């Protein structure tokens, strides 16, 4: 406070000698010093200069942002006050200049200075002029001052001698913004951020005091404090480099305007508006509307364009991510061609690969380390005289194709010994004469179906004579054959063909390797004891049936519970044969209607006729029920089944029809010739079959001993049988047809039964023959 009073006394003493020209120069210098002092203090001298000279009306020292804002606004100000040129005289020598209060930051650009200063060399016109910088003036007062007009050079100011210039009140920041004119630096001001509340309110008293002290130091006068002047000079030097460009532009612009102005002052200083109350130095922030940034929502006022913040709820659009480029699959690599690392002297071509599982020791000194896979599977034949080099060995890590197998017809060397524990593949056929004598048969081979290339006995190589009988247990084979006889008789009760696989599974079992002999022994027992023949009706599916032999005289119509069904079957077979070996379903049902049999009506003896014809007879292979080709809607027809061809013949059926009609079979010439040809073919086939059976039985040693000895039915295992749903499990032997029992007792008495006569012999044999004749008389009346 003491420094401030001393500085004020020095200025009063300097006022007595100052003229108007001096005042003009001082005002210009003061404005430039204010611009310099607005920069933030860069050294301790600036801080010292601004510290003790603070105005008592300010609440806090100006910050760096406030000083920068004052500099920007001062540079953009278009001064409305003209200054006189050099040698101009002031009419009022006693004019007083009061700079007691500093201008506000926002009010400087629009403040028209109302005081003129003399040139540097002009004499002071008013000895009593005083310059008071003790109080800061508000910016609001400067903004409201009337405009002043000044004359050009060498013109006198028409100001009264006692004009007083008072800058005591300072303008408010809000008032300055509304009256601020646009200057040449508008573009620069638009890019400047709007100051915050702290930068809008400031006290420039410290800057003005520092500027006045700097001017006094440059032109020393009485009563100037040395310390304050030095501090101001230091502050001006520190910010000179920072504000050099702005000072040059502002000074040049002011000079041009001073030289071009020739105006007069329109009003005196006494006509100024009343000073307003000093505003607070922390006024509210002034929003400055700028252009919205790209991508922002409309109708939003942005206060700080550079320090831009997103409004609530607004998010930046996420950048679109480019999907990663699709990677092409790696190029398929061609497997390298397999090369044979062994240099063969002669071309070796194997037909099929052979994989050796165990080491094989060759007669030559060559030891195979492991599995050997031969390349090139094409018919390999060694030239005569070719031998393996004595010193050649297979590389230890060499392997060929894993799926290569040896040829089936490749002969092994005669002197090539095989390891005793080396197993042969199960599906590798061997020559019939190449089976070692001491070669054991694996236990699991007993349940497999034997190959025709294998001998019945594993010790077949023991004898050089292949036709000689081999030592075996005949009693065990005959015992298994007897079980098979009982099994076949029970299975034939349902008239369903018997499969060979069922016989192997249920009866033969572990004797699979000799099953042909067991089956042949069973056939011999059936023929000699029961007069029944085991007939294979299907060579592909291996289906067997039991039929009566010609010597038994028990044809298709035996005295059984199925006699009515078999009588109807004989009529149906006749209808089919007389219609060209096929009869449509409509034709057959028309013939049965004339006999009083209709589909859908249950018969007391025959049951359901439709099920009997289309299911039971078809399942028993008596009939074949199939669809007519290319029929729309579909139609079905009946044909003879496989069993019918073996249990009867076309000639027998034709004789039956002729006997019913009391006509000669030769009356139907076409049917008679066809039946005769079939009968001749059947006789030739039966003769060839009988010859083959006799040869096989001689080779197997089957004779009368096969039927000798006690016969027991208690050794059969009933749980192995596959019964029909109509079977009686309590009394299984009741299922055996009566014909079988009659044939058995006939053979026991060594005579033929005379009570079983079929339609083949004559119409007056038995009740069954009469039943068939009655059906035939009704069913074949339409036959011409």
From Swiss-Prot:
It holds the Pfam family MAGE. Residues 302-450 are annotated as: 22 X 6 AA tandem repeats of W-[PQ]-X-P-X-X. Residues 195-214, 232-246, 259-269, 306-320 have a biased composition (Polar residues). InterPro entries: MAGE, MAGE_WH1, MAGE_WH2, MHD_dom. Transmembrane segments: none annotated. Coiled coil: none annotated. GO terms for cellular component: chromatin; cytoplasm; nucleus; plasma membrane; protein-containing complex. The keyword Cytoplasm applies. Keywords: Biological rhythms, Cell membrane, Cytoplasm, Membrane, Nucleus, Phosphoprotein, Repeat, Tumor antigen, Ubl conjugation pathway. Residues 404-418 have a biased composition (Pro residues). GO terms for biological process: circadian regulation of gene expression; negative regulation of epithelial cell proliferation. Involved in the apoptotic response after nerve growth factor (NGF) binding in neuronal cells. Inhibits cell cycle progression, and facilitates NGFR-mediated apoptosis. May act as a regulator of the function of DLX family members. May enhance ubiquitin ligase activity of RING-type zinc finger-containing E3 ubiquitin-protein ligases. Proposed to act through recruitment and/or stabilization of the Ubl-conjugating enzyme (E2) at the E3:substrate complex. Plays a role in the circadian rhythm regulation. Interacts with DLX5, DLX7 and MSX2 and forms homomultimers. Interacts with UNC5A. Interacts with TRIM28 and PJA1. Interacts with NGFR/p75NTR and RORA. PANTHER family: MELANOMA-ASSOCIATED ANTIGEN D1, MELANOMA-ASSOCIATED ANTIGEN MAGE ANTIGEN. This is Melanoma-associated antigen D1. It comes from Sus scrofa. The gene is MAGED1.
């Amino acid at each position: 406070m003491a420094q401030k009073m001393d500085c004020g006394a020095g200025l009063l003493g300097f006022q007595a000698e100052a003229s108007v020209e001096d005042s003009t120069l001082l005002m210009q210098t003061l404005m430039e010093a204010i611009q310099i002092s607005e920069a933030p203090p860069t050294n301790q001298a600036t801080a010292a200069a601004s510290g003790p000279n603070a105005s008592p009306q300010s609440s806090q020292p100006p910050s760096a942002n406030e000083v920068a804002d004052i500099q920007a606004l001062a540079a953009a100000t278009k001064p409305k006050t003209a200054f006189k040129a050099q040698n101009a005289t002031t009419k009022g020598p006693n004019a007083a200049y009061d700079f007691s209060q500093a201008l506000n930051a926002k009010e400087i650009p629009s403040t028209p200075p109302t005081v003129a200063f003399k040139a540097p060399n002009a004499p002071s016109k008013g000895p009593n002029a005083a310059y008071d910088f003790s109080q800061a003036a508000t910016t609001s007062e400067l903004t409201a001052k009337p405009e002043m007009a000044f004359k050009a050079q060498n013109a006198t100011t028409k100001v009264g001698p006692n004009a007083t210039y008072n800058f005591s009140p300072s303008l408010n920041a809000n008032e300055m913004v509304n009256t601020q004119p646009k200057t040449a630096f508008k573009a620069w001001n638009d890019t400047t951020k709007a100051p915050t509340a702290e930068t809008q309110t400031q006290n420039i008293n410290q800057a003005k005091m520092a500027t006045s002290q700097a001017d006094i130091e440059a032109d020393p006068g009485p009563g100037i404090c040395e310390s304050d002047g030095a501090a101001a000079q230091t502050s001006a030097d520190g910010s000179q480099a920072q504000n050099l460009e702005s000072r040059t532009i502002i000074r040049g612009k002011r000079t041009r305007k001073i030289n071009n102005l020739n105006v007069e002052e329109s009003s005196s200083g006494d006509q100024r508006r009343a000073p307003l109350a000093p505003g607070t130095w922390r006024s509210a922030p002034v929003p400055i509307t700028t252009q919205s940034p790209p991508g922002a929502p409309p109708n939003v006022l942005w206060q700080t364009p550079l320090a831009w913040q997103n409004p609530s709820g607004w998010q930046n659009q996420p950048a679109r991510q480019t999907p990663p480029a699709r990677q092409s699959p790696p190029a398929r690599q061609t497997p390298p061609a397999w090369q044979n690392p062994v240099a063969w002297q002669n071309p070796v071509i194997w037909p099929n690969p052979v994989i050796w599982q165990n080491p094989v020791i060759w007669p030559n000194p060559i030891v195979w380390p492991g599995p050997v896979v031969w390349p090139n599977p094409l018919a390999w034949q060694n030239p005569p005289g070719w031998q393996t080099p004595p010193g050649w060995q297979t590389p230890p890590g060499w392997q060929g194709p894993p799926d290569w197998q040896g040829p089936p017809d490749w002969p092994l060397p005669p002197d090539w010994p095989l390891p005793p524990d080396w197993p042969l593949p199960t599906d590798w056929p061997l020559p019939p004469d190449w089976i070692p004598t001491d070669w054991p048969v694996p236990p699991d081979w007993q349940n497999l179906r034997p190959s025709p290339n294998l001998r019945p006995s594993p010790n077949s190589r023991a004898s050089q004579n292949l036709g000689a009988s081999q030592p075996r247990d005949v009693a065990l084979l005959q015992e298994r054959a007897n079980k098979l006889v009982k099994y076949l008789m029970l299975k034939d009760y349902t008239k369903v063909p018997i499969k060979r696989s069922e016989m192997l599974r249920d009866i033969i079992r572990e004797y699979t390797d000799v099953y042909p002999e067991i089956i042949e022994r069973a056939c011999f027992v059936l023929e000699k004891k029961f007069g029944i023949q085991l007939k294979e009706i299907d060579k592909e599916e291996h289906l067997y049936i039991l039929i009566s032999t010609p010597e038994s005289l028990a044809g298709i119509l035996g005295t059984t519970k199925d006699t009515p069904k078999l009588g109807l079957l004989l009529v149906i077979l006749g209808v089919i044969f007389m219609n060209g070996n096929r009869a449509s379903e409509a034709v057959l049902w028309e013939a049965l209607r004339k006999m009083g049999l209709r589909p859908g009506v249950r018969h007391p003896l025959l049951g359901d006729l439709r099920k009997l014809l289309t299911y039971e007879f078809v399942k028993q292979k008596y009939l074949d029920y199939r669809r007519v080709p290319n029929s729309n809607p579909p139609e079905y027809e009946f044909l003879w089944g496989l069993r019918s061809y073996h249990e009867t013949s076309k000639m027998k059926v034709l004789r039956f029809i002729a006997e019913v009609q009391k006509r000669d079979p030769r009356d139907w010439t076409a049917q008679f010739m066809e039946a005769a040809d079939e009968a001749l073919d059947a006789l030739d086939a039966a003769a060839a079959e009988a010859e083959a059976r006799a040869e096989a039985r001689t080779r197997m040693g089957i004779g009368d001993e096969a039927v000798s000895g006690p016969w027991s039915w208690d050794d059969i295992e009933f749980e192995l049988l596959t019964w029909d749903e109509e079977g009686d499990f309590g009394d299984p032997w009741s299922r055996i047809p009566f014909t079988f029992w009659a044939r058995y007792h006939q053979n026991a008495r060594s005579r033929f039964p005379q009570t079983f006569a079929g339609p083949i012999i004559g119409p007056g044999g038995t009740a069954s023959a009469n039943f068939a004749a009655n059906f035939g008389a009704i069913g074949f009346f339409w036959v011409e």
